[in-house]
Amino acid sequence: MSYLVDTHCHLIFKDFREDLDSVINNAFNSGVKGMLVISTQEEEFNPLINLTQKYSNIFCSIGIHPHSAHLHSDISEELIIKFANNDRVIGIGETGLDFYYENSEKDIQIQLFKRHINASRETQLPIIIHTRDADDVTIDILKKESKKGSFPGVIHCFTAGPELAKAALDLGFYISLSGIVTFKNAEELRETIKDIPLERILVETDSPYLSPEPVRGGRNEPANVVHTANYLANFYDIDKQSFYEKTTDNFLKLFNKAKIINE
């Protein structure tokens, strides 16, 4: 029996404080056998690792979200690498650029993004990229940095246009799709992703945000990645179990430090 991995969730956010164990067990019982819990600021590093040590199929990343870049402008790639050496850490991020909200100055976001890239290049752990209203700058940085040495990565919660999709695929990156793809007003996104090879697609919730149809509007949780996966299986005209198997295989290829026990 095939299973799914939620490749991007935020389980240590306060939204899950009261019922985290129940949320995790609900995911396991729904066929979501693995979860990658994402770091957004330095204060989360140790709590994330502690959580992953409690559950064998939960892993974490280490990084600073662009919204928090101004609060961690002095963080070094050496510190990121130090935490990344932990057995339970399988990715770098989420990092990147967000020029929509601009909670942090653009220059600070760019500096931290490049430090994360250096850490990814050094460790060869995949970089998990957030980009919003910054696609051209993101593409430019990724192309220039890749010339210094390759690094694996994924564009998380992909909502961009074909230019970023092509640039990411050309660099060997993966594209992660969230519940947004199920929204009625996401026609442009669906048009962009229709030709992306299945070998490069991951699925995620970005929970507690972005609940997919038919549960849109409530708190999102890892179990709901099933809805997104089922929608995409139909979209790509592939049976559900094959889609589950393909996206899980993609996850294990990209995040090759992860070992999932399927019981």
Please provide the spans of the model-predicted regions:
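Mid-domain alpha/beta scaffold segments of enzyme catalytic cores
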Residues: 1-263
